[in-house]
Amino acid sequence: MKMMSTRALALGAAAVLAFAAATAHAQRCGEQGSNMECPNNLCCSQYGYCGMGGDYCGKGCQNGACYTSKRCGTQAGGKTCPNNHCCSQWGYCGFGAEYCGAGCQGGPCRADIKCGSQAGGKLCPNNLCCSQWGYCGLGSEFCGEGCQGGACSTDKPCGKAAGGKVCTNNYCCSKWGSCGIGPGYCGAGCQSGGCDGVFAEAIAANSTLVAE
């Protein structure tokens, strides 16, 4: 009995340590993370962690592709979604496969716009990412590995701590030396890139590069 209790305690301690380690390496954001925004338009949860899904994009979501209860599409007289969200086949605004996948009525639908090498080098509108499969959108599957153009993600350091390196895609180099978008990167202390709202202007300018 004593041996079982000791083993149970050991397993419990290991689980706690593993959870703590995972939490320590999770990217912080929002109020809990110096008002930093998440990369790739990931959602910042009410607890200040970046991710996708209901736990991050649902109730309390602080920034990124937060879910909304707004109606859109044919179910709402043809209304479109704010913040470049997708309008699902059921007429709700959001982000992810259930909104941007089959039946998507508007926004950065996955099969809506082709780009990159699969489309003769065409660029995506509004600085959306062109995925390795040649479709425009936002999120890690579009802006992560294999991204061909647009606001592709980068984990590269920048600024003084990185020998004066600048961020790609006109991303802002924060005062902490990391690339990203939003007040935490482009606001006070921004070292280079689209500081103080210049990024928004760059996106607007890039929107003229829509493929016909």
Curated annotation (Swiss-Prot):
Record's keyword terms, sorted: Chitin-binding, Disulfide bond, Glycoprotein, Lectin, Pyrrolidone carboxylic acid, Repeat, Signal
Cystine pairs: C29-C44, C38-C50, C43-C57, C61-C66, C72-C87, C81-C93, C86-C100, C104-C109, C115-C130, C124-C136, C129-C143, C147-C152, C158-C173, C167-C179, C172-C186, C190-C195
GO molecular function, one term: chitin binding
Residue ranges of every copy of the Chitin-binding type-1 domain listed in the record: 27-68, 69-111, 112-154, 155-197
SMART domains according to UniProt: ChtBD1
Glycosylation sites: N206
Domain of life: Eukaryota
Keyword Glycoprotein: yes
Residues the record lists as Pyrrolidone carboxylic acid modifications: Q27
Binding site for substrate: 36-38, 88-99, 140-141
Summary of the tissues where the protein is detected: In roots.
Pfam families: Chitin_bind_1
Range of residues in the leader sequence: 1-26
Described purpose of this protein according to its UniProt entry: Carbohydrate binding.
Protein name per UniProt: Root-specific lectin
Species per Swiss-Prot/TrEMBL record: Hordeum vulgare
Lineage: Eukaryota, Viridiplantae, Streptophyta, Embryophyta, Tracheophyta
